[in-house]
Amino acid sequence: MGETGVYARVVGKKVGEGKTKIVALRADMDALGMEDLKNCEYSSQNPGFCHACGHDGHTATLLAAARILKSMENDFAGEVRFFFQQAEEIGQGARQFVAAGLLEGVDRIYGQHVTNTLNVGQVGVVAGPLNASCDFFRIEVKGKGAHVSMPHKGVDALYVASQIVVAVQSIVARSTDPMESAVVGIGKAWAGTQYNIVAEEAVLEGTVRTFLPEVREATNRRLTDIVEKTAEMLGAKASIVIKNYSNPLINDADATKEAKLVAQEIVGAENIITDYPKSMMAEDFADYLPHCKGTFVYFGTHSDKPGTDRPNHNGFFDIDEEGLLVACNMFVRYALYVLGTK
């Protein structure tokens, strides 16, 4: 599926009454372009790349769940689809599964993610908004080169870009309802060719994160306006390209209620975190949810084991693999619950 994704399914052999159901289970697989700083037997073997977000754990967990459900195919009616999904980190993988028609007929889709904010044995189950949308933007500023000793003869694209960086901070501070959530961040900037030349070009790259469609639209519109007007005011030209990387992840109430019931059987009601905080980090599992009911939960992998307190996308990131047992159980039991086999 796509470049590196894998799709599989198990069809139950038990004869069901009436229409049988289909449930999809999803695990993301992609690694990150960063160095693994851990020194252990499972450290990355590929310089410059590593699993620092737990996707290897997700993949292992879904593989185990697939094996278990395959061994139980005589005990249930219906179908389980397994989505081993690529390209979550760039927000493109889920869309490829959707475009291939793999959600057709699916009654529920379930996904999950490791988190070091919960201890092993805890599960975060929340209905409604959980993860923000993600829009990527690239701003190109065109000025006019000159010798730095004669700045009046040029248009400094670097200076213009710096003013844009400052100006866009007003979007959240002064153009967004303070009761709503939004982030406008610029994480990459480059300009110029030499220390003594007025920069003729500058490039900025960043992201917009929101939960509500109307806030997302207004933020991107205001961002575009600030970029173009700031450049014009300072005698330069600027263009902006905005790409939709991921929609906001909003868990379906029914699917989440089912996941909560399943989690209670596995870890007990006292270990279910129903007030798990929303995150401005994006998750492209969201792109499945307009097409069928589904839910996404977080399972704890923090313990006394060194490294399990490190955040995602950190070179020392690690997990306590005991948490994967809970996740595997969640995959299997959620599928069986939806199919009517507890």
What are these model-derived regions, one by one?
Residues 1-19:
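A non-catalytic alpha/beta surface segment that caps or lines the substrate-entry region
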Residues 6-7, 32-34, 38-50, 56-57, ...:
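Histidine/acidic-residue-rich, glycine-tolerant segments that coordinate divalent metal ions
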Residues 11, 27, 84-86, 113, ...:
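Active-site-proximal beta-strand/loop segments in catalytic clefts of secreted hydrolases
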Residues 16-19, 75-76, 103-104, 289-291:
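Extracellular/periplasmic catalytic domains that process cell-envelope and extracellular macromolecules
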Residues 20-24, 79:
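Residues that mark the start of a beta-strand
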Residues 24-26, 35, 137, 296-302:
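Non-cysteine beta-strand/loop elements that form the S-adenosyl-L-methionine
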Residues 162-342:
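Metal-dependent amide/peptide-bond hydrolase catalytic core
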